[in-house]
Amino acid sequence: MAGIESVLQETRVFEPPASFVKQANIAGMDAYRTLCAEAERDYEGFWARLAHEHLLWHKPFSKVLDESRAPFYTWFEDGELNASYNCLERNLENGNADKVAVIFEADDGSVARITYRELHARVCRFANGLKALGIRKGDRVVIYMPMSIEGVVAMQACARIGATHSVVFGGFSAKSLQERIVDVGAVAVITADEQMRGGKALPLKAIADEALAMEGSEAVRHVIVYRRTGAGVNWVEGRDRAMDEVEAGQPDTCEVTPVGAEHPLFILYTSGSTGKPKGVQHSTGGYLLWALLTMQWTFDLKPDDVFWCTADIGWVTGHTYIAYGPLAAGATQVVFEGVPTYPNAGRFWDMIQKHRVNTFYTAPTAIRSLIKAAEADETSHPKRYDLSSLRLLGTVGEPINPEAWMWYHTNIGGGRCPIVDTFWQTETGGHMISPLPGATPLVPGSCTLPLPGIMAAIVDETGQDLPDGQGGILVVKRPWPAMIRTIWGDPERFRKSYFPAELGGKLYLAGDGSVRDKETGYFTIMGRIDDVLNVSGHRMGTMEIESALVANPLVAEAAVVGRPDDMTGEAICAFVVLKRTRPNGDEARQIATDLRNWVGKEIGPIAKPKDIRFGDNLPKTRSGKIMRRLLRSIAKGEDITQDTSTLENPAILEQLKEAR
């Protein structure tokens, strides 16, 4: 995997605005370097200081890092704390009790607000209700819920009593839900009658019932149902209870259960290359520390900020930057039930205007789809909305193409808002490589520099460091507090997946190709290692070819995959969404030729796609991620055998198959 060629040349640089630097939590590159130097000089002391300063401990820790069972590292192991206490009591005690914790906007546009005092009372009532059902410390609880205040309450209540939650995204099928229920050994499932998305109801309770009827789910004793819409649902006497009834009559206070710092706060499933999902296990102490620190560092959180992360609580972004980080930091945050295109593609901009959002954090794929919508319909263009409240933008989930970055910076940020392009993963717990908005000069398409304490490097397939300018494998050389602890029930898979022997067994394998700039030291993510293309012996990252395509004024979105080719070994296949209607026939052939030539000029002839297909959209999960595995199957002409239960737009698959 060494020797990936970096073909994307980006020379635009944006310095942090002086007014932003003046008030930043980390102001200027000298402040960043000072923190990095502290971590280099005394790694354990650096993390110990931060953990003592930022977390509330029931029992202070005496040991910082234990590496004796590497790669099964532990942090602050003899300390005890509670995540819910750090998110709720902290705010009751420091003057935030009557501050709005969550502004919830439902799919239909209705709004509810809840203060920290009210949220604390709700969490306590529900936690007491869970205890009354016999749910205890160490039990696993599956949460299969819509985006809602109740979803956050369920997660916080589990943390409060020491139960380990496993949130399953509301778009997953009954089979996918059942696999997770069985693998984690859940004793309870918390769900809703329905969830609303884009004006449509999805029957969560019916899906949960189907999952629980499958073999292996017998350990589930309780199903708790949040009545979101009031729709009639099947009811199993003795097993099923309404959420409000579980809370009814319970006290507004609930003593927290202190847990060890290494106690599993949650298990979150992520896709595995072999098909079986991986249960990523996260700790309480180290994870919560990083969730809080990155809120303060990357998002430069201020006391009066309104923060909005558009992710779902079913994904890690919704755990760290909705359920835990903002609450631990005492933020006011927006939680949104719906989708960015309902009732129209101006929904995000309308909500920023309505709630006076200061920090907006979303996915590049959402940005690209909204660029297309704005080009097609002036009424949904962001220029029609007052976005002056924004002071910081962020992106998450995949690399952002430079041209999408520029549109975001200009049209949403008004040219004044720094953009934090954050690289991280389910397994890392929080941001790993990201600009600090008051310190780092920004380069479109680059996630810039590792955060203080994160020892990122680029190596070859034997684990040897590569020189700057040469693409290779992204790794992390030292353990960090928020890292994955194991794969639930499968420690050997954990070791092989993340600390492979061929890299020496002690380097964390991120699974992404990356290159570090010779001049700045900035990291650019080139795509997943398994997305690297090898065309006539030239190794190229898909992200760079996609960026070249999206830089064309006709193109809204593009995804690039490889397929076998007798002549070149691998051929580049591009799936393209234009800013206008999908072309056909001679017109499609002409635009494809023009785009090939465009890529040839932007990168070089070697990067020209052999096959370009046009679609109305790309296959995406409900969280907005492009499902590249499906595109690889289409490019190869194979039948699609992968799980498509999270696919937002199944009809697009047939369209792309036929678009030859």
Swiss-Prot record:
UniProt keywords, alphabetically: Acetylation, ATP-binding, Ligase, Magnesium, Metal-binding, Nucleotide-binding
Residues that bind Mg(2+): V550, V555
InterPro entries: Ac_CoA_lig, ACAS_N, AMP-bd_C, AMP-bd_C_sf, AMP-binding_CS, AMP-dep_synth/lig_dom, ANL_N_sf
Organism listed in the record: Ralstonia nicotianae (strain ATCC BAA-1114 / GMI1000) (Ralstonia solanacearum)
Reaction equations catalysed: acetate + ATP + CoA = acetyl-CoA + AMP + diphosphate
Cited PANTHER family: ACETYL-COENZYME A SYNTHETASE (PTHR24095), ACETYL-COENZYME A SYNTHETASE 1 (PTHR24095:SF14)
Cellular component, GO, one term: cytosol
Residues with the N6-acetyllysine modification: K625
Post-translational modification: Acetylated. Deacetylation by the SIR2-homolog deacetylase activates the enzyme.
Record: residues binding CoA: R197, G198, G199, K200, T317, S536
Binding, ATP: G397, E398, P399, D421, T422, F423, W424, Q425, T426, D512, R528, R539
EC main group: ligase
Function of the protein: Catalyzes the conversion of acetate into acetyl-CoA (AcCoA), an essential intermediate at the junction of anabolic and catabolic pathways. AcsA undergoes a two-step reaction. In the first half reaction, AcsA combines acetate with ATP to form acetyl-adenylate (AcAMP) intermediate. In the second half reaction, it can then transfer the acetyl group from AcAMP to the sulfhydryl group of CoA, forming the product AcCoA.
Protein name: Acetyl-coenzyme A synthetase
The UniProt record lists the keyword Ion transport: no
Gene from which the chain derives: acsA
Molecular function GO labels: acetate-CoA ligase activity; AMP binding; ATP binding; metal ion binding
EC number: 6.2.1.1
Membrane spanning residue stretches: none
Short name of one Pfam family: AMP-binding
